[in-house]
């Protein structure tokens, strides 16, 4: 038989088993061959077509793992022999291509075998596209099953998988039809689709198992098989494709119950199998769903009532159940609302005491069912129901457990107390190791019922009705068939009219029990989803119904050779290691003795203290043996004399139903019988001896929610929903609806005019009330009276973070100079560790072990493992021995055709014959209670439009609790599906020389290299602002980056966190006497907010109660008291950039966390494309600080999205290896300067290179003045910058800052070549008359004679510049050769009047040149572009002395030139052509003390700064009491709004005031030492067209050539559009002028060649002219940015204040910065922080350095909003240094109280501690722009529940 069974499901490829089997029995060899063939066929059949997809296997859940392989299952997935159980923690997601082959077509068949453990709305699986749209999904709702075929397309089937049963089903997706196939293809429900479904699945999408999206609720249950077949027809014969383990999982295999607490569903209590009443033939009733055999000898019944107190091992003797002190509970009450938790609800529910009497074994394999001969039933049974108290047990008819049990643990009475709300599964004490001999009940004839012959004293305990709506299992007419003899049935029927059966005390008489099955293990189905209450049936009727229709079910034996007495403790105990979920284990004490003697059904309750993953994992079951002979007498029962059990007497008449208890109160009207007319209406109620009608009986009628214990005390209505009744300031609920911001105070009077630059200081944050509904945005207040333009205000507070700009270009590449002689070779850099960094870096630090990844697609089909289970000792045998079910051939290869529906291998789904209509009733019941509303899960993605869920009745709303603490900031949610990495910006044009990347980590100091030859003279750097004096320490070896610092101190102790998930209710106390439920009291008025209590510890999870029926929707509760300020919520993402709309309300600003330790510098990720400016959201009130959520890992850098919350600082990457230095290339020819290349992405910091070889001796540089030692470096490099926030509106002009300290002398640079004329400089403001004469500058080196410039157009009259420092007289320039007199050019357009240039130095008299031939009258040439500085030619021969040039106008001092990038030290190369000065590189690590540099020239004094950008609106004012409304500040970008206060007075829009007079003159700065001559400034403003100048000296000569006749001067160049004829005419003139030379000297250049070259030259010049013109006239756009905002002030068009783009280093446009320009106050350039709550600016260091160089002063505001917290103390009597905050400047200096640098504190409201929010305003004004922006705020006081603060960082404005 075993072989037959083993081959039953081999499939069609195999020969019929019986024939071969017989042969095999005769011939061993042939048998062996047959086994091989069968095995091969099995492999072939199980492997299936190569295209079939085993989803579990594809997700890495291989069966070998399920069966005990070594590989651990993923978290939240628990393997068990038949598959995997998915818990809430399960997270299985994989790319769709890893799970489904791309060749999978649109026609599919899904074959599923599963059992749900929790009622929820989870998806079993979902396939989503790369855009996160649902493409295919299967969702199980209570009572319905939805197939989603797209985001808005779904099909619903009336299939409820949440009934605790195993369901085997298939779905066919073909064309526009979806078909649900159950019952092995016998039941099909096709549903046409209204529209075409999506064509194909997105291969780049994702496959999620158990949920719809990563944040959705998880499917919790067991999954045996999930396969997808490309042939849709598979669905019609899906049973042939079910794995054998799945076919048998609910027939022979242990049920996998809900072994974990049900949060939202009913918990389970354990009950003995009612079928144990007979103890002979223990079968599983397909209609009852709670019990699951756990292992041999053990059974766990998960019933809806689980005691909340630990159940100790208690043995009960049924013989004592009928004592007079155990009156029966009126059965009607019990029957009505009690779910049947076990196969026969006989014991769980008096209505169905025997109805699950041993059903005929249900046969699952393809053998025809065989009927069991009736056997003698036993007479006793036991129902263990959770009792409220021992007294209640007595009342409820449950036996008192008084007999001591010699177990390993002291037994105590069962005192379980169902909680009225949630009850978690009871924990289980150590399993009893020994069994007591039960005392057989002695049933005298008098003790038998006169009709049924059942023992009179046999009373069936009732189960307290759970307050739930679970429909009774009886509502489903498909019940297990009970093999009740007709005569006996009639007896029972007859008795029903006079016994308690009519009252539903007893349901059916026991069926015959086969002795041969005495070792069969009772197995029941899970009753969790078989709610009671929908259909009330008498047990008798149930019995009849069960007799009529049901498939036989096979009992499960213990082990093949063991009787219960032989069962080892291992069979009956559970190892602690196997316990993972609380569960009760119920073991028959005597374990089914087969001897024909009355049995006392004693059971041991084992309370497993720890959760058991699966009790069934206690070892593989042995192979199922044949039914043994009747075993020896069973183990001793507990009660009764210890003597051996007498021989089993003939079975009584189905076990006495027990004497009727004393008349109980008249029961409620019984449920109508399933088969009307079959129940005897006879003395209805008399049989039940209904008691007086008064007491509702222990089951009490009330208690719709709680699970009343057996005593029937109605539980209170389930605790109202997740919001518990407000206890003493109950858990603060989730943040309540935004409450009003306090009672709006009276409209505040107009506040004082804000400090300059502040946009109306944000009111102090009010106490966090219940966040009010954001009020309407107040109208703009009346404009303040235009005040005098004040001093330059500090920059306004930051606006919302702007989009991050594209990566800034590297600093301006200086004009490519001629390759200079190589500079001194630097000290050899540290030797590179390796060669150039290869493509693959060295392995990073070993990451933490990730969770088990989704296994790749397994190669070979893994189904072979199924067969492998045959090798296990028990499985094949157990499955294969369904007893009479062995005939597998009836259904042919299907193997499962016999059982109706896959659902049913229990077959319950089909209507049970005559009782079909009743079955329909059952169906609604099967839906089970609508679970209480689950706790709000994370908001999932918008789910598909599912059908509306069954609305649960709304519970009585509890009074609104106080607003709960905002919960922990959620972990940064499961990272949204990582955005795709943003596109890398376009590859910039290849710049000439890229910026040197940020210096790699300083390597070990190399030997001092030989001083190289002097480098090409760089442009003189402008005098830097005085650097901070700092000793030049060698840069310390960068310490290893510590791990990212723990998140800073917890932010202020938040008020209580969100209401945590409701802890499980604690064990219910002893059930008190039942009190009447009080009426819900009137809703109390909100009390005054109490003192904020410390957050209570999270309560222990209480046991889970039964699911209460959702109460009716209550009226909205009264608005709760304002809660404590919630912890700061995470900052919402910045919205998508909109057009600059009206100022939106500020978005909620999250509570700033304490500054974390400096994180390690993260690698700069590729900058995404800049997002558009997001709308400024409303500023949320500072929430109470929640507990710090776990920091989410940094996600992939996505497309530039809205700035999200700052991610964790990434760990510092490994240092890159330093590449070997390349040989210096030969100097290239000086090329025309190309467009600035777009900056490359910032390279990662290379690893410290190895010590380099000793460099060549460099030339000794000029000795600089030693710098003071620098301050110690900041802790670590800053992490990557976040995105750039949008710039706030300009703030008002702040007061002039004090002059900065004088800078230190820098190195004297080598005189650079004469720069090209700079672009027109910005108009300076009227400078003040200098009072002091600057120190004379050092003598300038003699510059090369410049080419004569074209006459410039007259420039606008410039403002008088400051008086420059008297420069030293330069050496006279070399005398140039006289130029060739050129033809008279056309008069060019009149140039604007140029400013008076500096007087030219008298040149040496040049040699008189020969008079050239009179040139032809030249055509007026087009105005030439200003040519690039050509390479410095070799010194020519002295020319004839030229005429003295006219003194040029003194030009304005040019702006500081952009520093060129610092190039890496190369090996000493051949001296190259002098290069153009490069842009200043990023600051390297502090090197050795350099030679002291010369002082640079003092920078131009900038104009008074304009008002800074208005800052963000301050934190919300104190709750409800708006401060006096300030007068209208200058309009700026709306700050973040605080909570909506009362609308302010409408302000008048301020009229634009006239341009203010220059601000007050700042304090006289210290005259710095005379600086070096600065580099050539950028081209100054175009001067007025000057009169034609005298001929200038000829430029330096080229290499001597044959001396030619002086030619005519080239045509003047004007930046106008060339026409070809102009070019040709001009060139013709040139040709003509050179004709003489050709004739004279015999040149024979072809004219055409010359003309072509000339045209190209002119085109190049034209291009350069346009380029320079764009530089001279920037537009402030991203493509044509200005250097700083001041550049835009001098444009011809009037610019309005607003957002512009600047590029301080004038590199390529990709690194432009979006800033806010405040032209009203002098052209301030304002940088906004990334977020207003952090001092971080998304500006590269290079750009910031240039911006500092181009600025002379800076201003910034920082506001600290505080609640009962002092942040600043300064004064003689205050310990200022300890308690005052400190601000770290950009250059590392510290602003602190009492220090050298102190901020201005214009308002210090934080010193007021009155429980309201105040603010302290710090203003930083400095003439050392390098101090700004402020990069960190330190020494902030720690936060606590009543002390909080928030930062508001304003923009840093530079002028």
UniProtKB/Swiss-Prot annotation:
Residues 317-428, 511-580, 617-787, 838-1617 are annotated as: Disordered. It is found in: Secreted, Extracellular space, Extracellular matrix. Residues 1027-1036 have a biased composition (Gly residues). Residues 49-618, 1616-1855 form a propeptide. Pfam families: COLFI, Collagen. Glycans are attached at residues 281, 349, 1764. Residues 708-728, 905-918, 1083-1095, 1121-1131, 1161-1176, 1369-1378, 1404-1431, 1566-1581 have a biased composition (Low complexity). Residues 382-427, 520-532 have a biased composition (Polar residues). Residues 563-573, 1196-1221, 1320-1332, 1344-1354 have a biased composition (Basic and acidic residues). Residues 630-663, 1597-1614 have a biased composition (Pro residues). The gene is Col27a1. Residues 619-673, 682-741, 751-810, 826-885, 886-945, 946-1005, 1006-1047, 1048-1105, 1108-1155, 1156-1215, 1216-1275, 1276-1330, 1334-1393, 1433-1492, 1493-1552, 1553-1612 form the Collagen-like domain. Transmembrane segments: none annotated. The keyword Metal-binding applies. Residues 81-246 form the Laminin G-like domain. Ca(2+) binds at residues 1703, 1705, 1708, 1711. Its main location: secreted. One of its GO terms (molecular function) is extracellular matrix structural constituent conferring tensile strength. Keywords: Calcium, Collagen, Disulfide bond, Extracellular matrix, Glycoprotein, Metal-binding, Repeat, Secreted, Signal. Residues 1-48 form the signal peptide. This is Collagen alpha-1(XXVII) chain. Disulfide bonds join 1685-1717, 1726-1853, 1762-1806. Residues 1655-1855 form the Fibrillar collagen NC1 domain. Residues 619-1612 are annotated as: Triple-helical region. One of its GO terms (biological process) is extracellular matrix organization. It comes from Rattus norvegicus. Belongs to the fibrillar collagen family. Plays a role during the calcification of cartilage and the transition of cartilage to bone.
């Amino acid at each position: 038989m075993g072989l037959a069974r083993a081959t039953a499901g081999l499939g069609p490829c195999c020969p019929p088993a019986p024939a071969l089997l017989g042969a095999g029995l005769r011939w061993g060899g042939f048998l062996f061959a047959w086994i091989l063939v069968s095995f091969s066929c099995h492999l072939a059949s199980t492997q299936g077509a190569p295209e079939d997809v085993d989803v579990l296997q594809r997700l890495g859940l291989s069966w070998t793992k399920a069966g005990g392989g070594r590989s651990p299952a993923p978290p939240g997935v628990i393997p068990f022999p038949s598959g995997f159980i998915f818990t809430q923690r399960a997270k299985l997601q994989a790319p769709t291509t890893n799970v489904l082959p791309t060749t999978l077509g649109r026609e599919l068949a899904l074959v599923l075998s599963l059992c749900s453990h929790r009622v929820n709305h989870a998806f079993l699986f979902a396939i989503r596209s790369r855009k996160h749209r649902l493409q295919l999904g299967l969702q199980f709702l209570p009572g319905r099953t939805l197939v989603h075929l797209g985001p808005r397309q779904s099909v619903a089937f009336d299939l409820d998988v949440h009934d605790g049963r195993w369901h085997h089903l298939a779905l066919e997706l073909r064309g526009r039809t979806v078909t649900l196939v159950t019952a092995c293809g016998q039941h099909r429900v096709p549903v046409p689709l209204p529209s075409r479904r999506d064509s194909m699945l997105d291969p780049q999408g994702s496959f999620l198992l158990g949920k719809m999206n990563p944040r959705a609720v998880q499917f919790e249950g067991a999954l045996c098989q999930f396969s997808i077949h490309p042939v849709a027809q598979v669905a019609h014969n899906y049973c042939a494709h079910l794995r054998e383990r799945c076919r048998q999982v609910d027939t022979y295999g242990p049920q996998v119950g809900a072994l974990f607490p049900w949060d939202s569903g009913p918990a389970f209590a354990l009950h003995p199998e009612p079928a144990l009443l007979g103890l002979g033939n223990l079968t599983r009733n397909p209609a009852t769903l709670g019990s699951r055999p756990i292992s041999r000898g053990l059974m766990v019944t998960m019933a809806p009532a689980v005691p909340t107190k630990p159940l100790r091992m208690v043995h009960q003797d049924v013989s004592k159940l009928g004592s007079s002190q155990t009156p029966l509970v009126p059965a009607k009450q019990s029957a009505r609302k009690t779910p049947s938790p076990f196969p026969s609800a006989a014991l769980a529910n008096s209505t169905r005491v025997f109805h699950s009497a041993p059903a005929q074994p249900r046969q699952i394999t393809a053998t025809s069912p065989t009927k069991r001969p009736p056997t003698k039933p036993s007479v006793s049974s036991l129902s263990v129901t959770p009792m409220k108290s021992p007294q209640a047990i007595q009342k409820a008819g449950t036996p008192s457990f008084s007999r001591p049990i010699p177990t390993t643990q002291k037994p105590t009475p069962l005192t379980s107390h169902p909680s009225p709300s949630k009850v978690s599964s009871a924990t289980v004490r150590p399993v009893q190791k020994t069994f007591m001999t039960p005392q057989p009940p002695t049933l005298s004839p008098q003790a038998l019922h006169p009709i049924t012959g059942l023992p009179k004293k046999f009373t069936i305990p009732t189960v307290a009705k759970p307050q739930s709506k679970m429909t009774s299992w009886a509502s489903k007419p498909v019940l297990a068939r009970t093999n009740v003899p007709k005569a006996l049935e009639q007896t029972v029927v007859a008795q029903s009219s006079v016994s308690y059966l009519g009252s539903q005390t007893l349901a059916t008489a026991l069926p015959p029990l086969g002795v041969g099955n005495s070792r069969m293990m009772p197995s029941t189905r899970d009753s969790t989803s078989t709610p009671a209450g929908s259909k009330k049936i008498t047990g008798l009727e149930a019995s009849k119904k069960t007799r009529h229709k049901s498939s036989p079910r096979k009992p499960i034996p213990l082990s093949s050779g063991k009787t219960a007495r032989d069962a080892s403790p291992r069979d009956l105990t559970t190892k602690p290691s196997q316990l993972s979920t609380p569960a009760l284990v119920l073991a028959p004490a005597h374990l089914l003795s087969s001897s024909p003697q009355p049995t006392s059904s004693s059971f041991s309750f084992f309370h497993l203290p720890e959760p058991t993953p699966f009790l069934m994992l206690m070892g593989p079951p042995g192979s199922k043996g044949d039914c043994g002979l009747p075993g020896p007498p069973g183990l001793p029962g507990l009660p009764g004399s210890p003597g051996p059990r007498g021989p089993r007497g003939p079975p009584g008449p189905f076990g006495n139903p027990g004497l009727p208890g004393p008349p109980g109160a008249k029961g409620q009207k019984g449920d109508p019988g399933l088969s009307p007319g079959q129940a005897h209406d006879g003395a209805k109620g008399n049989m039940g001896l209904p008691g007086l009608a008064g007491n509702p009986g222990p089951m009490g009628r009330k208690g719709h929610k709680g699970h009343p214990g057996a005593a029937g005390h109605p539980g209170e209505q389930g605790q109202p929903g997740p919001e518990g009744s407000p206890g003493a300031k109950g858990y603060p609920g989730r943040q309540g609806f935004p409450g009003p911001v306090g009672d709006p105070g009276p409209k505040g009077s107009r506040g004082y005019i804000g400090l300059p630059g502040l946009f109306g200081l944000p009111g102090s944050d009010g106490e966090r009330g219940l966040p009010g509904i954001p009020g309407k945005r107040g109208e703009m207040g009346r404009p303040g009276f235009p005040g005098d333009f004040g001093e330059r205000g500090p920059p306004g507070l930051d606006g919302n973070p702007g989009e991050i700009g594209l990566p800034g270009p590297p600093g301006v590449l200086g004009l490519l100079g001629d390759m200079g002689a190589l500079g001194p070779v630097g000290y050899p850099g540290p030797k590179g560790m390796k060669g150039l960094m290869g493509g693959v870096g060295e392995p990073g630090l070993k990451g933490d072990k990730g969770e088990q990844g989704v296994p790749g697609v397994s190669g070979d089909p893994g189904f072979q493992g199924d067969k492998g289970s045959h090798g296990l000792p028990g499985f094949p045998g157990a499955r294969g021995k369904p007893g009479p079910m062995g005939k597998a051939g009836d259904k042919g290869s299907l193997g499962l055709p016999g059982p109706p529906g896959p659902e049913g291998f229990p077959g319950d789904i089909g209507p049970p014959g005559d009782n079909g209509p009743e079955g329909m009733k059952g169906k609604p019941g099967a839906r089970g209670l609508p679970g209480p509303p689950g706790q709000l899960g994370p908001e999932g993605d918008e789910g598909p439009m599912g059908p509306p869920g069954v609305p649960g009745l709304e519970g009585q709303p509890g009074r609104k609790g106080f607003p709960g603490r905002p919960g922990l900031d959620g972990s940064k949610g499961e990272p949204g599906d990582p955005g795709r990495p943003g596109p890398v910006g376009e590859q910039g044009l290849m710049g000439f020389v890229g910026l040197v990347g940020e210096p790699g980590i300083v390597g070990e100091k190399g030997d001092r290299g030989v001083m190289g030859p002097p480098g090409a003279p760089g442009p003189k750097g402008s005098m830097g602002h005085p650097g901070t004096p700092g000793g030049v320490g060698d840069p310390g070896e960068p310490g290893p980056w510590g791990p990212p610092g723990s998140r800073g101190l917890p932010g202020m102790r938040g008020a209580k966190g969100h209401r945590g998930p409701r802890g499980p209710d604690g064990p219910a106390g002893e059930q008190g006497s039942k009190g009447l439920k009080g009426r819900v009291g009137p809703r109390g008025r909100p009390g005054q907010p109490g003192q904020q209590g410390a957050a209570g510890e999270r309560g222990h999870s209480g046991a889970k109660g039964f699911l209460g029926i959702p109460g009716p929707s209550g009226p909205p509760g009264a608005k709760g008291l304002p809660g404590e300020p919630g912890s700061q919520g995470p900052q919402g993402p910045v919205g998508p950039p909109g057009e600059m709309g009206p100022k939106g309300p500020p978005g909620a600003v999250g509570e700033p966390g304490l500054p974390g330790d400096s994180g390690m510098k993260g690698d700069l990720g590729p900058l995404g494309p800049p997002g558009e400016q997001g709308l400024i959201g409303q500023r949320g009130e500072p929430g109470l600080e929640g507990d710090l959520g776990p920091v989410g890992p940094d996600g992939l850098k996505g497309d530039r999205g809205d700035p999200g919350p700052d991610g964790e600082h990434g760990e510092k990457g490994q240092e890159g290896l330093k590449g070997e230095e390349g040989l210096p290339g030969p100097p290239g020819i000086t090329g025309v300067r190309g467009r600035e290349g777009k900056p490359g992405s910032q390279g990662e910091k290379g690893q410290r290179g190895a010590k380099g070889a000793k460099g060549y001796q460099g030339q000794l540089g000029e000795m600089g003045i030693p710098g003071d030692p620098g301050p110690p470096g900041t802790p670590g490099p800053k992490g990557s910058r976040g995105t750039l926030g949008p710039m706030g509106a300009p703030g008002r002009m702040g007061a002039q800052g004090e002059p900065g300290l004088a800078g230190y002398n820098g190195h004297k640079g080598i005189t650079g070549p004469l720069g090209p004329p700079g672009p027109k400089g910005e108009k300076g403001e009227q400078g003040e008359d200098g009072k002091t004469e600057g120190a004379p500058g050092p003598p300038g080196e003699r510059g090369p004679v410049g080419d004569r410039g074209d006459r410039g157009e007259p420039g606008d009259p410039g403002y008088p510049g400051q008086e420059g420092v008297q420069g030293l007289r330069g050496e006279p320039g070399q005398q140039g050769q006289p130029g060739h007199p050129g033809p008279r050019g056309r008069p060019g357009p009149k140039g604007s009047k140029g400013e008076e240039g500096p007087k030219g130095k008298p040149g040496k008299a040049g040699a008189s040149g020969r008079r050239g031939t009179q040139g032809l009258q030249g055509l007026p040439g087009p105005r030439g572009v200003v040519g690039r500085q050509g390479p410095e030619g070799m010194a020519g021969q002295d020319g004839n002395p030229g005429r003295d040039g006219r003194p040029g106008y003194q030009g304005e001092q040019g702006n500081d030139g952009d520093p060129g990038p610092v190039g890496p030290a190369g090996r000493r190369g051949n001296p190259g052509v002098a290069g153009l000065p490069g842009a200043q590189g990023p600051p390297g690590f502090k090197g050795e003390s350099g030679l002291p540099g010369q002082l640079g020239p003092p920078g131009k004094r900038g104009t008074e700064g304009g008002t800074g950008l208005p800052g963000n609106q301050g934190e919300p004012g104190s709750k409800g009491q708006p401060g006096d409304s300030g007068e209208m500040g200058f309009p700026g970008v709306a700050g973040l709004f605080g909570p909506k206060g009362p609308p302010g007075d409408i302000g008048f829009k301020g009229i634009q005031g006239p341009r203010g007079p220059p601000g007050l003159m700042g304090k006289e700065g210290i005259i710095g030492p005379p600086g070096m001559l600065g580099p050539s400034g950028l081209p100054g403003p175009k001067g007025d067209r000057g009169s034609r100048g005298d001929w200038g000296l000829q430029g330096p000569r080229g290499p001597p050539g044959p001396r030619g006749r002086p030619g005519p001067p080239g045509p003047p160049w004007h930046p106008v559009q060339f026409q070809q004829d102009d070019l040709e005419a001009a060139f013709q003139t040139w040709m003509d002028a050179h004709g003489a030379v050709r004739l004279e000297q015999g040149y024979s250049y072809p004219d055409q060649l010359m003309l072509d070259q000339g045209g190209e030259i002119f085109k190049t010049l034209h291009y350069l002219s346009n380029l320079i013109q764009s530089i001279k006239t920037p537009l402030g756009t991203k493509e044509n940015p200005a250097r700083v905002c001041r550049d835009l002030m001098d444009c011809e068009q009037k610019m309005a204040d607003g957002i512009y783009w600047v590029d301080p280093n004038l590199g390529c446009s990709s690194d432009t910065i979006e800033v806010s320009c405040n032209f009203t106050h002098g052209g301030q350039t304002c940088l906004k922080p990334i977020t207003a709550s952090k001092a971080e600016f998304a500006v590269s260091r290079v750009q910031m350095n240039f911006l500092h160089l181009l600025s002379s002063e800076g201003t910034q505001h920082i506001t600290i909003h505080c609640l009962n917290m002092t942040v600043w103390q300064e004064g003689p009597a205050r310990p200022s240094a300890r308690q005052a905050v400190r601000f770290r400047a950009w250059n590392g200096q510290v602003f602190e109280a009492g220090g050298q640098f102190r901020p201005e504190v214009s308002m210090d409201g934080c010193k007021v501690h009155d429980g309201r929010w105040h603010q302290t305003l710090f203003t930083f004004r400095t003439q050392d722009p390098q101090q700004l922006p402020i990069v960190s705020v330190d020494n902030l006081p720690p936060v606590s529940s009543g002390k909080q603060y928030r930062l508001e960082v304003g923009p840093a404005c530079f002028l």
